[in-house]
Amino acid sequence: MNDPRKGADAEPTTHFGYQNVPESQKAKKVAEVFHSVAAKYDLMNDLMSGGIHRLWKRFTIELSGVRSGNRVLDIAGGTGDLTRQFSRLVGPTGEVVLADINASMLKVGRDKLLDKGVSGNVSFVQADAEKLPFPDNHFDCVTIAFGLRNVTHKDEAIRSMLRVLKPGGRLLVLEFSKPSSNLLSKAYDAYSFSLLPLMGKLVTNDSESYRYLAESIRMHPDQETLKAMMVEAGFDRVTYHNMTGGIVALHRGIKP
C-alpha cells in the first residue's frame, strides 16, 4: 500500500531541458552547464547565431530608453555585451550592475570588460534572479538576455525584477521563443538538435551542454505566455517584438 505521506513530502520537480529533476538540483545542473561553456561562450554565440545575436542585443539597447545618469541592472549579464553598451550610455553619473548567478560567467565578464577599459560605473554581483539583493525602487532599467529560460521559478524572478525597478522603470527580456511559422520551426529544431550539439563538441568538447540549450529553448514559455506572466506579476504596457521570425523575442514592460 502506498504511503500518502511520502507523496506529500516529495520535493517538487521542474524541467532541466527535457528531464524532470528535483527543484533543488536544477540550479546546480544549470551552473555545471555554464561553468563548462564560460570560456568559449562568446565564440559559440557568434558561431551559433552567425553573429546575429549582436543585432538582437543592439535592438534591446535601443528599446531600453537608457540615458545619462540612469541606474541599470543587467541580470544574467554573462560576458557583458549589454553591460558594456549601458556603461557608455549612462556615463560617469550613472551606474550599471552586471549580475550573474554563475561565478565562472561573472569572472569571464569582469575580465573581458576590464580588458576593454570598462570600469568606474560598472559593478559585478553574483546574484540569483529570484532573490535579487537590491533595494526596492532602485533601478531605471532591468534587462535579462538569454537567461530567463534557465531560471527555476520564472514568476518569482519577474516579481523580483518588478520590485527593484523604480516606478516607470522598464524591464526588457530578450530570449529565444517560438518561431512564427511551422516551416521555420521545423528547420530551427533540426538545426538546434543536430548542429548545435555537434558545434559544442567541436569547439568546447561538450555536446551535452548544447543539447540542454536546445531543449531549454523548447521548454521556455512562448511569446503570449511570457507576456501574460509579466502582466500577472504587475507590469503595465507589456509588448513584445519578434526577431528573426520569432526565433527570438524581446518583451518590454513598465512598472506602474
From Swiss-Prot:
UniProt KW keywords: Menaquinone biosynthesis, Methyltransferase, S-adenosyl-L-methionine, Transferase, Ubiquinone biosynthesis
GO molecular-function terms, A-Z: 2-methoxy-6-polyprenyl-1,4-benzoquinol methyltransferase activity; demethylmenaquinone methyltransferase activity
InterPro entries with a match to the protein in the record: SAM-dependent_MTases_sf (IPR029063), UbiE/COQ5_MeTrFase (IPR004033), UbiE/COQ5_MeTrFase_CS (IPR023576)
Disulfide cross-links: none
Biochemical pathway: Quinol/quinone metabolism; menaquinone biosynthesis; menaquinol from 1,4-dihydroxy-2-naphthoate: step 2/2; Cofactor biosynthesis; ubiquinone biosynthesis
One Pfam short name: Ubie_methyltran
Binding site for S-adenosyl-L-methionine: 79, 100, 128-129
Reaction(s) catalysed (UniProt annotation): a 2-demethylmenaquinol + S-adenosyl-L-methionine = a menaquinol + S-adenosyl-L-homocysteine + H(+); a 2-methoxy-6-(all-trans-polyprenyl)benzene-1,4-diol + S-adenosyl-L-methionine = a 5-methoxy-2-methyl-3-(all-trans-polyprenyl)benzene-1,4-diol + S-adenosyl-L-homocysteine + H(+)
EC number: 2.1.1.163, 2.1.1.201
Gene3D superfamilies in UniProt: Vaccinia Virus protein VP39
Top-level EC class: transferase
Statement: the UniProt record of this protein carries the keyword Amino-acid biosynthesis: no
Any GO BP annotation: ubiquinone biosynthetic process
Functional note: Methyltransferase required for the conversion of demethylmenaquinol (DMKH2) to menaquinol (MKH2) and the conversion of 2-polyprenyl-6-methoxy-1,4-benzoquinol (DDMQH2) to 2-polyprenyl-3-methyl-6-methoxy-1,4-benzoquinol (DMQH2).
PANTHER family: 2-METHOXY-6-POLYPRENYL-1,4-BENZOQUINOL METHYLASE, MITOCHONDRIAL, METHYLTRANSFERASE
Similarity annotation: Belongs to the class I-like SAM-binding methyltransferase superfamily. MenG/UbiE family.
Record-given protein name: Ubiquinone/menaquinone biosynthesis C-methyltransferase UbiE
Organism field: Pseudomonas aeruginosa (strain ATCC 15692 / DSM 22644 / CIP 104116 / JCM 14847 / LMG 12228 / 1C / PRS 101 / PAO1)
